[in-house]
Amino acid sequence: SSCFAIDHKKVKWFGLDRCATDTEAPTGVYHDGAYCPVCHAPMEYEYVHYNHIGAYRCTSCGHARPDPDYAATELDLQNGKLILDGQFTVALAFRSIYNVYNILAAYAACRECGVEGAAIADTLSSYILKNGRMQTFTLGQHHGTLLTSKHENSIAYDTNLRYIASTNEDCTVLIIVDAVSRKYFTSETSWLWDIDFDQLNVPHVKRVILSGMYRNDLAERFRFTGVQNWEVIPGIPDAAAAIRDSGSEALYVVTCFSDRDKLLNLPDVKKEG
């Protein structure tokens, strides 16, 4: 997208300034932004928000991150606070880096349409997605959050795994791959190797359960991670029952739109909101 409308006069840019969760270099399994999309020379980064998103600059032609017209100037994910253009505060209902980009895009579009910044920030504060990408529920004594991640899209997975790793609360993680795509049938799962599952190798993730038709593909992928406390439970109902009957820690479910209702529609799962 950094190449869209290069040198066009009617372009407005939005972006996130440097924040506490940034890294000095990309940290994923692979690097999408290693080479310049203009001249194909190596790229360098001042900081990285996630994957290839951050302050980039080509070492050859100078293609670089534009100065944003609208910016998230301060971000505190731990306390759920976002400041836009240095003055408008948004309370984050969901404390994830990609949610910040969604908010920032909406803010920029509304400002271009003439809406006052304070009104936008007030409307966006504590906004909860209603499109099913995030669903809270209870299962037994567990409070659960389902994080929809597009299969065949490692960035979607990585950002959700990063969110789980950032919570610092004891939890179980259930990963379901039962259908690869809603649009077509395929059993191709090489995309699992592009996902940084090692993000779950943190002390507060007490248990990782792999379930669904492609649980063995997931298991093979996990054998090449540092995560030790994973197990396979083939059927989704059986996985849910095993979680229901044990413990009360937080529960995070990572799966796609095709598979989400296979869990949420189970009798023991009580959706919230």
Task: List each language-model region with its residue ranges.
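A short, sequence-level motif marking secondary-structure junctions
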Residues: 91-98, 148-152
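Extended acidic/charged loop-beta regions that coordinate divalent cations
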Residues: 2-91
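Short glycine/threonine-rich catalytic loop with a Thr-x-Gly-x-Asp
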Residues: 28-31, 94-105, 131-132
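Generic secretory/membrane-interface signal
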Residues: 11-14, 96, 172
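A short local loop/turn or secondary-structure capping micro-motif enriched for an aromatic residue
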Residues: 21, 100, 153-154
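Glycine/charged-rich beta-loop-alpha catalytic/anionic-binding loops adjacent to active sites
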Residues: 84-92, 137-144
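ATP-dependent carboxylate-amine ligase
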Residues: 30-33, 37-43, 50-65, 108-115, ...
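Helix N-cap / loop-to-helix initiation motif
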Residues: 99, 116-117
